[in-house]
Every structure is written in structure tokens, then in C-alpha cells.
Swiss-Prot record:
Its cofactor is Mg(2+). This is Nucleoside triphosphate/diphosphate phosphatase. SUPFAM superfamilies: FomD-like (SSF159234). Has nucleoside phosphatase activity towards nucleoside triphosphates and nucleoside diphosphates. It catalyses: a ribonucleoside 5'-triphosphate + H2O = a ribonucleoside 5'-diphosphate + phosphate + H(+); a ribonucleoside 5'-diphosphate + H2O = a ribonucleoside 5'-phosphate + phosphate + H(+). Keywords: Hydrolase, Magnesium, Metal-binding. InterPro entries: DUF402, FomD-like_sf, Ntdp-like, SA1684. GO terms for molecular function: magnesium ion binding; nucleoside diphosphate phosphatase activity; ribonucleoside triphosphate phosphatase activity. Mg(2+) 2 binds at D105, D107, D120, E123. It comes from Bacillus subtilis (strain 168). HAMAP family: Ntdp. The active site is at R23.
Length: 176
């Protein structure tokens, strides 16, 4: 599979289970990259939706991908603290130009005080039926939703108190 080089700027591609593109983030700077984990950052990057619409992200974000976890985490730096958006997804793959993963609709929005909301459960159920997610996938996704919630409660990995600030400081070195 390989993995991107630190300092490299790459795209992030999100797909749906049926193989169709869901969303593309145009530019993310790689801050750490190993076979197991990729950490990237972006700020005001263009995002292209599956229907061709585009928009620009509003704030700096630290992106966390793991090769064995069925979720990814985006920590967004806002005036009132770090907000997290977590996608229940396949583990990432890297093809030499982009980090790629399958977005499985379930999301968790985490606030600076570490309270959270689970989002899009109806969309998940609709897509699970429409795209015939195998029972094994459904079971894996539900297990990893619980793993993600455990990480949030324990402030593990990207939810550790200084994680996002530390990686944002490193990102600033690349933007000078």
C-alpha cells in the first residue's frame, strides 16, 4: 500500500460502499506518516462534493487516519476550542496520490467539553439497505463506533488534550 511522505501535499478521497466518490479534499499536508497512521493538516482547502459542488473549509483541521481502525478523526481548531468530526469508515489506503477510504455514514460530532452526538443513523440504515452492506461490515462498524466512543471517553489518540494543538504547531512550520 505505501504511505505518503511527511511534508507532502496530497488529496483525501472519500467513497461510498458502492465505489462512487463521495467527497474530495484538495490539499492536505502530511505531518506524520507510517504504515499504521497518517496525520495531516489543512486550512481553507477546497472540498468537492459528488455532485460537483465545491466549498472551502472554514478553519484549520488536523486529520487522523489509522490503518487498523474503522474510523477517522478531524480535529477543527475554532475560537471556543477543538471540535471533532469523526467518520465511521474503512481503514485508509494510500495509492500514491491520495488517502482513500469508504465513508459509512455514521458520524460522531465531539464538542470541546468532550460531549458528543452520534449523527446520521437514519442515513446509515438507508444506505445499509440500499447498498446491501454485508452483516459482517455492519457488525464491524458498530464495534468500531463503540471503540471510537471509548477513545473519546478516555481522551485517547487524537482526543488527547494536546494532540491537535501539537500537530497544528507542526503544520505552521510548513506554511511559513
Amino acid at each position: 500500500m505505501g504511505y505518503p511522505k511527511e511534508g507532502e501535499t496530497i488529496q483525501i478521497h472519500s467513497y461510498k460502499h458502492n465505489g462512487l466518490i463521495h467527497r474530495i479534499w484538495n490539499e492536505t499536508t502530511i505531518l506524520k506518516s507510517t504504515e499504521m497512521c497518517v496525520i495531516g493538516a489543512n486550512d481553507r482547502t477546497m472540498v468537492t462534493e459528488s455532485d460537483g459542488r465545491t466549498w472551502i473549509t472554514r478553519e484549520p483541521a488536523i486529520c487522523y487516519f489509522h490503518a487498523r481502525q474503522w474510523f477517522n478523526v478531524i480535529g477543527m481548531l475554532r475560537e471556543d476550542g477543538v471540535h471533532y468530526y469523526c467518520n465511521i469508515s474503512s481503514p485508509f489506503a494510500y495509492d500514491g496520490e491520495a488517502i482513500k477510504y469508504i465513508d459509512y455514514d455514521l458520524d460522531v460530532k465531539v464538542f470541546p467539553d468532550m460531549t458528543y452526538n452520534i449523527l446520521d443513523e437514519d442515513e446509515y440504515d438507508d444506505h445499509r439497505k440500499a447498498m446491501n452492506y454485508p452483516k459482517e461490515i455492519d457488525s464491524i462498524l458498530r464495534d468500531y463506533l463503540n471503540t471510537l466512543l471509548h477513545w473519546i471517553h478516555q481522551r485517547q489518540g487524537p482526543f488527547a488534550p494536546e494532540f491537535v494543538d501539537m500537530w497544528y504547531e507542526r503544520y505552521l512550520r510548513y506554511t511559513k
